[in-house]
Design a protein with these regions (language model features):
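Long, low-complexity, polar and repeat-rich extracellular regions
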Residues: 2-5, 10-318, 323
Length: 326
């Protein structure tokens, strides 16, 4: 009797495993059927719901004429692996790349250049995942939108993302109201991500709605702001966080920062420079070891970071939480 029961039990286990393997096979077939290999230059000018997988070097994908790549799942556009070089993605105004899951655009460790005048978005985290790449270039033009409901541009944790260049004249933002809500994170867990260069031009907006820092940098990186960088959750939250050493932040012209500017405890060589013009007054909420310098020769008042122009009054003791004062 026991032997018979054991045999029935074994048959049921084998049947279960067979059904499971068959289901997995069918799932992979469905996933693969919704993917297109891209081995040469390609233009998309209508709705395409298939994942675009770049399989060769020096491929240029152009999305134009209100065309879109709309992926149900993650990774709407990706390199096939870390050996893929020279990928260029251009998204024209009115066109878009979206996904319902994470990593809308994933570099997979390969080379990638993104020129966006349209929309890159996901309902969850990581509109752009830099995934251990080196030298990625992202240009977000005026009218361009890069957004997520989590960390929006990410090159962190174990993946890093050295020598990333971001030039923004549009909007880069996160709508997440809790944690994992940064607009840009380019710092891995031990702060060895280096060489980031972020320029936020006049009219450019980088902001978030949650508890985390709006922008997070690793080490030996630069951030130049002539637009706006805002932590919309609270002026007590960090707008700019420097996790490592030897970073340089330059705040220019009529640019504003809403939120704290913080260098992490124990870091060295971090610089905060002001270039708002002669006689212009400003006040920033800062913390950590930062070397302050006004490039226009205005006197910098430490405490937070304030400057007074000729004949102006000192703003050092005002309780203004942040921003630029004219």
């Amino acid at each position: 009797m026991l032997t018979r029961l054991s045999q029935i039990y074994s048959l049921k286990i084998e049947l279960f495993i067979s059904i499971l393997l068959l289901s997995l096979f069918l799932f992979l077939q469905i996933v693969n059927s919704n993917a297109e290999n891209v081995g040469a230059d390609k233009t998309i000018s209508s709705l395409n719901e298939n994942q675009q997988v770049v399989t060769a070097d020096d491929v240029h994908i152009t999305i134009t004429n209100n065309g879109s790549v709309e992926r149900t799942g993650q990774k709407a556009i990706k390199n096939t692996d870390s050996e893929t070089a020279g990928t260029i993605l251009t998204i024209h105004s009115g066109s878009s790349v979206t996904s319902t899951a994470a990593n809308t655009i994933s570099t997979e460790g390969g080379e990638f250049e993104i020129n966006n005048s349209g929309t890159i978005s996901t309902n969850v985290s990581k509109a752009i995942s830099l995934f251990d790449s080196d030298g990625v270039s992202i240009t977000n033009n005026s009218g361009g939108i890069i957004k997520s409901d989590g960390n929006t541009i990410l090159g962190s944790a174990s993946t890093g993302a050295d020598n990333t260049t971001i030039v923004n004249s549009g909007e880069i933002f996160s709508t997440e109201t809790g944690d994992s809500s940064s607009a840009i994170i380019l710092a891995d867990s031990d702060t060895t991500t280096t060489g980031t260069n972020i320029t936020n031009n006049s009219g450019g907006e980088i902001y978030n709605a949650g508890n985390d820092s709006t922008i997070v940098l690793g080490a030996s990186s630069t951030l130049t702001n002539s637009g706006s960088i805002k932590n919309n959750k609270s002026v007590s939250n960090k707008a700019i966080q420097l996790k490592g050493n030897n970073n340089t932040v330059t705040l220019k012209d009529a640019g504003i920062v809403v939120g704290k500017i913080k260098a992490a405890n124990g870091t060295t060589g971090n610089k905060l420079r002001f270039n708002h013009g002669v006689g212009r007054a400003y006040y920033y909420d800062i913390s950590g070891d930062l070397t302050l310098e006004d490039l226009d020769g205005n006197q910098v008042v430490k405490g937070s970071a304030g400057s007074v122009g000729q004949g102006a009054v000192s703003y050092t003791h005002l309780t203004l939480p942040t921003s630029f004062l004219v």
